[in-house]
Amino acid sequence: MTYQEIQAKARDCVGPYCKSCPVCNGLACKNTIPGPGAKGIGTGFIRNYQKWQELCVNMDTICENKPVDTSFDFFGRKVALPVFAAPLGALTLHYGDKYSDLAYNEILVPACAENGIAAFTGDGTNPTLMQGAAQVLAKNGGCGVPTIKPWNMETIKEKLDLVKAADPFAIAMDIDGAGLPFLKNMTPPAGSKTVEELREIVAMAEKPFIVKGIMTVAGAKKALEAGAKGIVVSNHGGRVLDQCPSSAEVLPAIADAVGSKMTILVDGGIRSGMDVFKALALGADGVLIGRPFINMIYGAGAEGVKVYVEKLKAELEDTMAMCGAHSLADIKRSMIYGY
């Protein structure tokens, strides 16, 4: 199946909220939660996508003609390209009843591994969600990053014990998850964390720890102070706070501040290999992509993941070659027009 055929098939089964748009840009689903949309009037999601599109790349083909290498070492695991499936949860609430969270992860995690990347897995108020994710990760050699919500410390410890048994190569927390409307006043309680609390969580993890939901230099420095080995520059796809900057806008300053000291990932509106290139040029080491993987799996299961990863890789390779970059280390900010 082609990418377009998979998108069309997904429209028949992805549920009442997501429209499986040809371009996933937040316009058709703004202010749709439950669903794939963003909080408030939806500008967070829309701005995320638009700001990547506003960036232009500098073409330069007066360079050596040799193969392009997109491989990336991620906490000791080599991946084929610096792209990861973002953590998603409560699928039946947001995307219809075709897949439970467990069924989705049972397709996503091995399909990502087979195609040379890795998946971050999601969390939710139902404890079976993380239990299922841990089981899938264990069955696939720990090839993935379980992502825990910022619950109270007792619940975090329970979930850390659960996922550590799966031996993942890293563990994450989407610390901005407390802003999700459907988590408000829920049990277990979720909320922000101090540097001291985060330091305690990092120590309990006993794995490289990634803090997802960083949008300022100050936040990045606090994550570093707490001992995190990586961050994800992210506004949760616009789902936790409306009218904030896009991840593309804040990424360069954050990368300049902490990029030499920790791994920097970014998400939010990244859809193509060209977008991946732009993110790397602005200082990211890798990217997370969320909503499009939903459509690929709902449209064609594991085949959808394969088609999308191959599309991203081909687009990234083409952009690198046309800009004179033959490895990820060759990608420089000067390859973005105006920088």
State where each predicted segment sits.
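An N-cap/entry alpha-helix motif that binds or orients negatively charged groups
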Residues: 2-80
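N-terminal functional module of multi-domain proteins
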Residues: 44-130
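Alpha/beta enzyme core
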Residues: 110, 138-139, 151-266, 273-296, ...
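Internal helix-turn-beta structural module
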Residues: 285, 301-329
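Short hydrophobic alpha-helical runs that function as membrane-insertion/retention elements
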Residues: 118-123, 145-147, 232-233, 287-289
